[in-house]
Regions:
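Catalytic domains of carbohydrate-active enzymes, especially glycoside hydrolases
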Residues: 95-121
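C-terminal tail/sorting-segment detector
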Residues: 505-512, 526, 566-591
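Active-site-adjacent "subsite" loops/lids of carbohydrate-active enzymes
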Residues: 63, 71-92, 164-216
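Beta-strand-rich modules
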Residues: 473-491
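Pro/Thr/Ser/Gly-rich low-complexity, intrinsically disordered linker/stalk tracts
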Residues: 397-437, 492-505
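Aromatic-lined carbohydrate-recognition surfaces of secreted/lumenal glycan-active proteins
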Residues: 161-173, 227, 248-291, 338-341, ...
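Residue-level detector of functionally pivotal "anchor" positions at catalytic/ligand-binding pockets or at interdomain
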Residues: 408-416, 499-522, 588-591
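Substrate-binding cleft of secreted/luminal carbohydrate-active enzymes
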Residues: 299, 309-320, 339-407
């Protein structure tokens, strides 16, 4: 649960069929192999096996949002100690953050959503609201340094974006520092529900005030995004207006903030974290908890109209309460960024005690859909809860860059010029270049033993969002290098290629998977082409929980799935030795 957000993990039964595997091997397969196949198919893979990246899945994409919510309220993610303003306490608190950021960077994270406005309180010196107590231990008291500026600098050093996470409607306990100062200044703006205070979503001044807060952040800090949280009606609010009017009220607040932010820095990414199910789907109910109808969050419409550049839906669900709704977010993304929030905290035995493969399979599917992913929250990831951090490091073996916001600007910056390369006696290599518009550009650096360096291959990325026009690299042998300029919208120039380097050209890997879901029209599934290195003769269709639905010969271009119930499935190959490989994911959907 994030900031009082209600997550409703539910289970769903799936249909059961009994496939006739014997017919597939009636003359060529031994009983021993059959037993192995049946054991693998019906029992499923072990958690360890399911958490392993398959050799037959696509390589890590170059463009992908890999985000994490870093929570400051109560210091539950950070900080773990208080700063009284002394050099020692400041350094200790800052070291805690840099340790977390180092861990996140090593796991492939490229976007940090840092809780900046907590409960009408902030982690920076604001002219409008008091300091939050998470830093000093006392609300209203400075920790002796600007925590937001420090976090921005440290994220940017590591090539990561920092988005200021702004909690909008909730303002804390009725007697808390943030709520009390707002009540005194704007008595008609704050409503009490139980022991808590909330900004009135039906008061036009709410949007104006929150726009002022976000403008203060954007004007004073080099944030890469403004991330709105709880931009909705509270679930405990008795909505007396029509749902249509309720959606207009919330949209007016979101629009006011977005317009203000873009008027100051149009490249700052606007995003929010809607409820994980946009609305009821044709075949899948939201079970009474969705964004659009229940709390008047018209998030998909915000993407369409440009109010938002990105969505981070809180999809803290599993099974059929996750997969169909993930597809819905993808289908209604309008070419914008969607990076669903994962219930990583549910791996904890005191939360949902989910097995690891629930989250890892969701990550595989999101990547197949071309979506990003966001861990809720940082501590559960970096604590390696049930091995999720170990998995994330394998899953994100290569760096990724955030997709460009081409709907805002699609003009490519000019490529860097005057490439210089110097190899030191230590083996280190210093690269330098020039750029005409250096004050407004960042740089990506690539290396490969093949010339020209392929900048579309994520395996060649060695640094992203580099801020200077020079970099020194550790000795790793002889390579060719390339440098690109990147503007604040994420548009990347053509590469400036080095002319020095050595090494043999490497061949491409033989892969099966596509860049998205396997094609399926609800009746016919397109099988991926079988490479020469794969000796499998059978494919199995399984639920995401590993339950076997049917087995089919691995031959031809198509498989008949007309008798498979609608739902989300994985396709696996099985060879005569009972060894399985995941080939991809697909959805059976009939209209």
């Amino acid at each position: 649960m994030k900031n009082g957000k209600k997550a409703v993990p539910l289970s769903q039964k799936s249909s059961k069929t009994t496939p006739n595997v014997m017919n597939l091997y009636r003359s060529t397969t031994s009983l021993y192999a059959l037993l192995l196949i049946l054991l693998c198919a019906f029992c499923g893979l072990s958690t360890q096996a399911q958490s392993q990246p398959s050799l037959f899945l696509q390589p890590s994409p170059k463009h992908e949002v890999r985000a994490v919510w870093l929570t400051t309220i109560g210091g539950i993610d950070w900080p773990h100690s208080y700063s009284n303003g002394s050099a020692t306490s400041i350094e200790r608190q800052q070291r805690e953050l840099t340790t977390i950021l180092d861990q996140l960077k090593a796991a492939g994270t490229n976007v940090v959503l840092l809780q900046t406005r907590v409960r009408a309180t902030t982690i920076y010196p604001s002219a409008m609201e008091p300091w939050d107590g998470c830093l000093s231990g006392n609300p209203g008291k400075s920790p002796g340094y600007d925590a937001l500026q420090f976090a921005i600098d440290e994220c940017h050093k590591r090539g990561m974006q920092l988005h200021a996470w702004v909690v909008t409607i909730p303002v804390g306990k009725w007697t808390s520092a943030g709520c009390m100062q707002l009540r005194k200044r704007y008595p008609k703006l704050i409503k009490k529900i139980g022991p808590d205070g909330y900004m009135d979503p039906e008061n036009m001044q709410t949007g104006s005030y929150l726009a002022d807060i976000c403008e203060e952040i954007v004007r004073n800090y080099d944030v890469d995004g403004i991330h709105l949280d709880y931009i909705r009606y509270p679930e405990t609010w008795k909505i007396k207006v029509s749902r249509t009017q309720g959606r207009r009220n919330i949209t007016a607040i979101a629009s006011a903030i977005s317009r203000r932010v873009k008027s100051v820095k149009p490249w700052v990414m606007m995003s929010c974290s809607p409820i994980g199910k946009s609305d009821d789907l044709r075949r899948y109910s939201s079970r009474g908890w969705n964004a659009r109808t229940v709390v008047c969050q018209d998030a998909q419409e915000w993407l369409r109209t440009g109010v938002m550049d990105a969505l981070f839906p809180m999809m803290y669900f599993r099974d059929n309460h996750f997969y169909p709704f993930a597809v819905d977010w993808q289908e209604q993304s309008y070419g914008k960024i969607v990076a669903p929030g994962l219930g990583t905290y549910m791996l904890n035995r005191h939360e949902g005690n989910w097995p690891l493969n629930v989250v890892t399979q969701e990550m595989y599917v999101l990547r197949s859909l071309g979506l990003g992913h966001t861990h809720f929250r940082s501590k559960f990831l970096t604590d390696n809860t049930k091995g999720i951090y170990t998995f994330a490091r394998r899953f994100n073996q290569t760096p990724a860059v955030v997709p460009p916001m081409t709907w805002l600007s699609s003009t490519l910056p000019d490529a860097p010029t005057h490439f210089q390369q110097h190899k030191h006696a230590s083996g280190e290599v210093t690269l330098a270049w020039q750029s005409a518009d250096a004050a407004h550009l960042l740089y990506n650096i690539y290396a490969s033993r093949t010339w020209p360096v392929d900048i579309d291959d994520a395996r060649n990325i060695i640094a992203t969002r580099h801020t200077s026009q020079q970099i020194t690299l550790a000795p790793k042998g002889n390579f060719f290098y390339a440098v690109t300029a990147v503007d604040r919208y994420g548009n990347e120039s053509k590469p400036l290629q080095s002319v020095e380097g050595a090494g043999a050209r490497t061949g491409a890997r033989e892969l099966i998977a596509t860049d998205g879901l396997l094609k399926c029209d609800g009746y016919k599934l397109t099988l991926p082409e079988k490479p020469s290195t794969l000796d499998a003769n059978v494919v199995c269709i399984e639920t995401m929980q590993g339950k076997l639905m049917t087995s089919l010969p691995y031959r031809g271009k198509y498989a008949d799935v007309s008798k498979v119930p609608e739902g989300f499935y994985q396709l696996r190959s099985i060879n005569k030795r009972g060894i399985t490989h995941r080939l991809g994911f697909f959805m059976v959907k009939r209209r």
